[in-house]
Amino acid sequence: EATDIQIALSKLNKTDRIIVSLCVVEGYKSHEVGKILSMNPSTVRTRLNRGLEKMREYLEVQ
């Protein structure tokens, strides 16, 4: 299952992959990721949710 998650993560574009990794794996908050990536925290949350949804869709097909 970890490999499937890694593959699903690799399907995301670079920025979304970084956001998902920082928020989910590393435990950063959206405002912290926003500072790191020079993004609005609401943009980080939107991209996180979209990235996770894309990963869910990929994993459901597997």
Write out the residue ranges for each language-model feature.
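Short, basic, alpha-helical segments at the C-terminal edge of helix-turn-helix-like DNA-binding modules
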Residues: 60-62
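Helix-turn-helix DNA-binding module
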Residues: 10-18, 26-43, 54-57
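Short alpha-helical "packing" element that flanks the helix-turn-helix/winged-helix DNA-binding module
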Residues: 5, 19-20
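IQ-motif-like calmodulin-binding regions
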Residues: 23
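Acidic, proline/glycine-rich intrinsically disordered inter-domain spacer in sigma factors
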Residues: 1-10
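Residues within the DNA-recognition helix of helix-turn-helix
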Residues: 47-52
